Design a protein with these regions (language model features):
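Acidic, low-complexity N-terminal propeptides/linkers enriched in Ser/Thr/Asp/Gly that mediate export
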Residues: 120-240, 406-471, 475, 480, ...
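Proteins synthesized as precursors that undergo proteolytic processing into mature forms
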Residues: 373-399, 504-569
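Second-shell loop/turn segments in exported
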Residues: 57, 106-122, 360-362, 372-378, ...
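Substrate-recognition/specificity elements adjacent to catalytic centers across diverse enzyme folds
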Residues: 28-243, 250-256, 260-263, 269, ...
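Bacterial N-terminal signal peptides that target proteins for export
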Residues: 1-9
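Bacterial N-terminal signal peptides
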Residues: 9-17
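Glycine- and hydrophobic-rich flexible loops that cap the catalytic core of alpha/beta enzyme folds
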Residues: 261-263, 273-277, 282-446
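C-terminal motif of bacterial Sec signal peptides marking the signal peptidase cleavage site
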Residues: 19-21
């Protein structure tokens, strides 16, 4: 025992020196100095005496774990994807470069960076210098990850990193196809220059809302926790590959900052996390950050439009993009990108640019330069009022909601996303036109998008003195709640933030009110609001940290809870169904579904068959009473409606199709989820629990193909299935940085997962370690205090370099 105490004491002295000695060991003014301790799972605890040195440490250590993804994100932000990687599948690299350049993101970066505060400039510059130090010391040819030897991995500038922030914040780069395809009808030469894939309304809506980036967020106040202090669950659903992965870190400036959490790769600071007094998470908002405008064109001049009866010219920005061919030679490709005074012109299959009308878009984040300011203010806040003031002052979160809790037991929700501020008259007129104008109605009723009359100035955004970006809704008019019980969000609008007391009366640009919610929102609502003795919070109806964790990992399928018994009852009435001329025996399927426990755990038999059944329906059916549900949505009972099986015959036909899929895949009808759903991490195939939105589960595991040059495991799609491949369900998206936090009398206590691991380097031990923990639902402790860090220290070092 004495020996162990001695070793721990020695470690504590080392850590105390590293984490708290900056003032005594202050570096010369011309030198960066950051002290880094790594604990289990590769988590860095970085201490510095100013933001420049803090960024220096962040940049170097982030490069150790993710040099390839950071380098790739900078290539994207520079508009150089086609230069290094060719035009890309369906010209996506070329289109991305054109739009990023046309928006002026890299061209304006120097001016925009110079307008940042001195502290921000120091932080960003320090980060780039830390990253560059890693590149110089290791050398591109000695990188052990997937970009080894790549000519696009090179030193970067502060302006490059600032461009990366702008690409993250703005919406237009995500919908490059609809912008590049917008050409005047007479411009035949330019129209033939680039083949643009047809984008459907649904695909457009997904890209605009970043809807593939989902999340759950729960915050509990003093009335709903066992100890009367705040609790938080952060559960962002983000990519497991590419540049939108999270990276975990602990940042310390003694006497000023002590923040633990995660941010997207290549970004300084913490976006989701906690300090001694405040903890928060984000979910992607359901708001309309972009609105569309229909322009009435001047006869004979399709590049001029009427505005309050007067003609106004569009502008063309001719882009010259360097493109690497398959033989390695580089050529130049030119094309014009067109703009109205609102923003880029756009084109859609059902709304092309004609001689009479054209569409344009306005992005509420086009002038948003204060993202780093807001997250920094949130990181530094020491009470909930200061945290809310960060939102009020900066008003800069581009597309997320915030759920926050505090040591004194407050639960706060803010939809701080940027949306345009329309007058009440404009809103009323637009609402009328959703009924009277077919295209306006199609935009809204089909996909929930806003189309306005761009030739009428009354649809301009209205200024407010508190708005940081002219024309956006200020903090005072954003949906928000400050409560002592709970709030939550699962990517639907603000309306059902609290089950018993919904939020009403906000701009429709923040999303619908008194409308059907997703099945995922509904299961989240049940988990957080249930205070019954047998509910997730136990007999007292108040959560402990473990109970909150278990609620998420209960992996309940609300869809199964609502429909499984009725499907089983229906299938017991028949022996077979004819599908596409084939008689399909349902006896085995009926038996398998009888044994399904309505959860999505690894040992849940019948879960795969049920998934294949529910995904035979269109996802939109899960919101209404039509083909799937019998009872309609009721605004007075939003958690429990719609419900009931609508059409037994269709249900059995879809069950037969699911049986066919299982047979083609070579899977038994009673296969468990663990036999079919995997993450491939290098040579490891790891079974993981969780499910898709249609299954009505909180713990999301999904399949997406993302922006990266790294290898991604792919399989051949099984005929008749939306997701199943010959390699199973290949998880590449879902639960990412999972944070469970409880404030106690002794400070914050947290446990977490970074589900895909801290490192993107396949040779690192931290490439698969946390995925295996997640598979077994084994939460790991977060090391926040000096004592805990000392006990778990795996390495320590001091990083220095010349200050820029």
């Amino acid at each position: 025992m004495k020996k162990n105490i001695g070793l721990w004491g020695a470690s504590l002295l080392v850590v105390a020196g590293l984490l708290g000695s900056c003032a005594e060991q202050k570096a010369p003014e011309d030198t960066y100095r950051a002290e880094v301790v790594r604990t289990s799972f590769g988590i860095p605890h970085i201490t510095a005496d100013d933001f420049g040195s803090l960024g220096f440490g962040e940049g170097f250590v982030a490069a150790e774990d993710h040099v390839c993804n950071i380098a790739h994100s900078i290539v994207v932000a520079r508009g150089e994807r086609a230069l290094y990687h060719g035009v890309g599948e369906k010209n996506k690299h070329l289109m991305s470069d054109m739009v990023i350049r046309a928006l002026g993101i890299p061209a304006n970066a120097a001016e925009d960076f110079a307008a940042q505060s001195k502290e921000n400039q120091q932080w960003i510059t320090g980060y780039t210098e830390g990253y560059n130090k890693y590149i110089r010391e290791v050398g591109v040819d000695n990188i052990t990850s997937w970009c080894k030897g790549a000519d696009w991995v090179r030193e970067i500038t502060p302006e490059d990193l600032f461009s990366r922030f702008q690409v993250l914040a703005q919406t237009a780069p995500r919908v490059a196809g609809m912008i590049v395809s917008a050409k005047p009808p007479a411009d035949k030469a330019d129209a033939a220059a680039l083949e643009v894939p047809v984008q459907t309304f649904a695909e457009m809506a997904d890209d605009l809302r970043a809807s593939q980036m989902g999340s759950n967020g729960w915050a509990f106040g003093k009335d709903r926790t066992e100890n009367g202090r705040g609790m938080l669950l952060g559960n962002p659903h983000y990519p497991w590959t590419g540049t939108s992965r999270f990276w975990e870190k602990h940042l310390i400036i003694p006497g000023k900052m002590n923040i633990y959490g995660a941010h997207l790769i290549g970004a300084p600071g913490v976006a989701i996390g906690f300090n001694e007094n405040i903890g928060w998470t984000h979910t992607v908002s359901n708001s309309e950050r972009v609105v569309f405008y229909k322009l009435d064109l001047v006869p004979g001049d399709p590049t001029s439009y009427y505005y309050d009866g007067e003609p106004r010219k569009m502008t063309a920005r001719k882009m010259t993009i360097s493109v690497k061919g398959e033989d390695g030679t580089v050529t130049e490709q030119e094309q014009s990108v067109w703009f109205s005074h609102y923003g880029p012109m756009v084109s859609l299959p059902n709304a092309p640019w004609t001689e009479k009308q054209a569409l344009t878009m306005r992005d509420a984040n086009a002038g948003n330069q204060n993202l780093l300011d807001q997250w920094k203010a949130m990181d530094l806040a020491q009470d909930m009022d200061a945290f809310k003031d960060a939102h009020r002052k900066w008003n800069a979160l581009p597309w997320v909601n915030t759920m926050a809790t505090s040591k004194d037991g407050r639960a706060v929700f803010i939809d701080g996303s940027n949306v345009g501020r329309l007058s009440a008259e404009a809103i009323a007129l637009w609402q009328e036109r959703t009924k009277s104008d077919p295209l306006t109605g199609e935009f809204f009723n089909g996909m929930g998008l806003i189309l306005l009359d761009g030739s009428d100035s009354q649809f301009e955004w209205q200024a407010h003195p508190e708005a940081r970006v002219p024309g956006i809704v200020p903090y005072v008019e954003q949906p928000k709640y400050d409560r002592s019980d709970y709030i939550f969000n699962a990517n639907d609008s603000h309306w059902l933030t609290h089950v018993e007391e919904p939020l009403n009366g906000y701009s429709p640009l923040f999303g619908s009110e008194q409308a059907a919610r997703s099945l995922r929102t509904r299961i989240n609502a049940k988990l957080v609001s249930d205070t019954s003795p047998d509910g997730p919070a136990g007999v007292d109806g108040k959560f402990s940290l473990k109970e909150m964790q278990q609620a998420l990992f209960s992996n309940r399928s609300l869809t199964a809870e609502l429909l499984l018994d009725e499907v089983v009852a229906a299938c017991t009435k028949v022996t077979s169904v004819i599908v596409d001329g084939e008689e399909v025996d349902l006896a085995g399927a009926c038996t398998a579904l009888k044994g399904y426990n309505k959860h999505l755990d690894l040992d849940s038999t019948g879960a795969v068959l049920f998934r294949e059944w529910i995904t035979q329906y269109k996802y939109t059916e899960t919101f209404k009473n039509d083909k799937l549900f019998k009872l309609a949505f009721d605004p007075a009972d939003p958690v429990n409606t719609p419900r009931g099986l609508a059409d037994e015959g269709l249900a059995l036909k879809n069950l037969a199709k699911a049986v066919q899929v299982m047979t083609r895949a070579g899977l038994a009808l009673d296969s468990s989820l663990g036999e079919a759903q995997f993450v491939y991490r290098g040579a490891d195939r790891i079974a993981v629990h969780g499910g898709e939105n249609a299954e009505g589960i909180a713990n999301i595991m999904a399949q997406r193909i993302y922006d990266t040059q790294a290898h991604q495991q792919r399989g051949a799609k099984v005929e008749g299935s939306k997701m199943l491949t010959d390699k199973g369900y290949l998880v590449t998206h879902g639960a990412s940085f999972l944070l469970s936090l409880s404030y106690t009398d002794d400070g914050p206590v947290a446990e977490a997962f970074l589900t895909y691991g801290q490192s993107g380097d396949p040779t690192s031990v931290h490439y698969t370690d946390q995925t295996k923990l997640f598979s077994q639902k084994q939460w790991r402790p977060v090391r926040f205090t000096k004592q805990d860090i000392a006990k778990d220290m795996k390495s320590s070092r001091v990083l220095t370099g010349p200050r820029k």
